[in-house]
Design a protein with these regions (language model features):
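Glycine-rich, acidic and aromatic/proline-enriched surface loops and short helix-turn segments
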Residues: 60-68
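Residue-level signal for the nucleotide or nucleotide-sugar donor/cofactor binding architecture
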Residues: 53
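Second-shell loop/turn segments in exported
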Residues: 44-50, 79-81
Length: 131
């Protein structure tokens, strides 16, 4: 079942607007050197962002997690939650991304677990399932 929030019917009385698609987690208390994934530059910068991507490539990344060259994007991209977006919605996302200011920023490569990150990163928190 698709999350109501992603189907255009958010339940504003619930956390995350009723969506079951939330951020990935890590445990900085238990993992001294967790793997680190840096988010991509999705501004329309032609050299370091998505400025040279076609609308179809942007839409395919959102809906299927497929990058510009046909490769699967990072595993934390929750594309499964966006797969059922309407054509109008995914076209609006692509149009919005094209409308923002381009920022030249080369993103660091991901860091494998156990290795030291050479760039700063943020822990979003420690999450535990409630019994």
């Amino acid at each position: 079942m698709i999350a109501r929030a992603l189907a255009g019917e958010p339940d504003l009385t619930k956390r995350f607007a009723g969506s079951s698609i939330v951020i990935a987690w890590s445990n900085p208390v238990g993992d001294e050197r967790p793997g680190v994934v840096y988010p991509p530059n999705i501004t329309p910068d032609p050299d370091t962002g998505i400025g040279n991507w076609t609308d179809d490539q942007i839409q395919n990344a959102v809906r299927a997690g497929i990058g510009r060259h046909g490769n699967r994007r990072i595993s934390v991209m929750p594309w499964q939650g966006y797969a059922q977006l309407t054509d109008d919605d995914v076209e609006a996302i692509a149009a919005y991304l094209r409308s923002i200011e381009p920022i030249s920023h080369r993103v660091p490569r991901e860091v494998k677990p156990g290795r030291r990150a050479s760039e700063p990163f943020v822990y979003f928190g420690v999450y535990r399932q409630r019994d």
